From Swiss-Prot:
CDD domains, alphabetized: UGPase_prokaryotic
Origin: domain of life: Bacteria
Gene Ontology biological process terms from the UniProt entry: capsule polysaccharide biosynthetic process; UDP-alpha-D-glucose metabolic process
GO molecular function list: UTP:glucose-1-phosphate uridylyltransferase activity
Keyword flag Nucleotidyltransferase: yes
Catalytic activity: alpha-D-glucose 1-phosphate + UTP + H(+) = UDP-alpha-D-glucose + diphosphate
Record protein name field: UTP--glucose-1-phosphate uridylyltransferase
EC number: 2.7.7.9
Top-level taxonomy: Bacteria, Bacillati, Bacillota, Bacilli, Lactobacillales
Family label: Belongs to the UDPGP type 2 family.
Species the sequence originates in: Streptococcus pneumoniae
Amino acid sequence: MKKVKKAVIPAAGLGTRFLPATKALAKEMLPIVDRPTIHFVIEEALRSGIEDILVVTGKSKRSIEDYFDSTFELEYSLRKQGKMELLKSVNESTDIKVHFVRQSSPRGLGDAVLQAKSFVGDDPFVVMLGDDLMDITDSTAVPLTRQLMDDYNATQASTIAVMPVRYEDVSSYGVISPRLESSNGLYSVDAFVEKPKPEEAPSNLAIIGRYLLTPEIFSILETQKPGAGNEIQLTDAIDTLNKTQSVFAREFVGKRYDVGDKFNFMKTSIDYALQHPQIKESLKNYVIALGKQLEKLDDCSSSGHL
């Protein structure tokens, strides 16, 4: 039985929701307090037992490669000044074994995953999307990627992470048509549907950015026709795979943080900051004071006195 040791992280998107910042900085490098978002994804991979990581990048993504490269001058300066805690935090990213490949143009998630074919070979692997951060404020939780790996060890089948969303939001996701719950939280699936209309959605169980796939997915992606948004959709390829071999869905019951838009990015930053040992107390006091200030403004507004 082949073990799951490889992870693929697509990071070639243009990040248009965060312009103009992403004109010069990769979206995956936007910081949650003091760590870029991609750091949390890779941290989840390592905690799950992943040994080899491939990041699929595109143009203007050099900052990701720089983050995982050593910086001799900085490390020397920190060591000379005796700033060993900062040095340790810098080395967190340079001690990780990360490979890179470039997607020539953004043609969809399916095409990004296809760029990993030679890296993956004949092994099962996980795909981890950077817009979804899982349980980043709970270091005791079993990582979602680890849960998918455990499912694979039991079934030897591809398994996709899903989570309930509001029906009015299903058109932003791929969703599943569940057949039955074969064990606690693990579903057999009739179909995978990319971004359905709410009235046509087979369920509200949405795919949330963690996939464990068998290598047979690549032969499907090589001939996959463009789908929603005129892009090569990974969900469509998974639905095709499900017709020849079982693909399961694992319902995630932890805390998912969506960092794909400004509002949810800020919510994630606040939640994480309120757990950060260096700033949590000061931030908590500030948030409480700000809440009281906003209540006063609301009271004045409702009474007509500003």
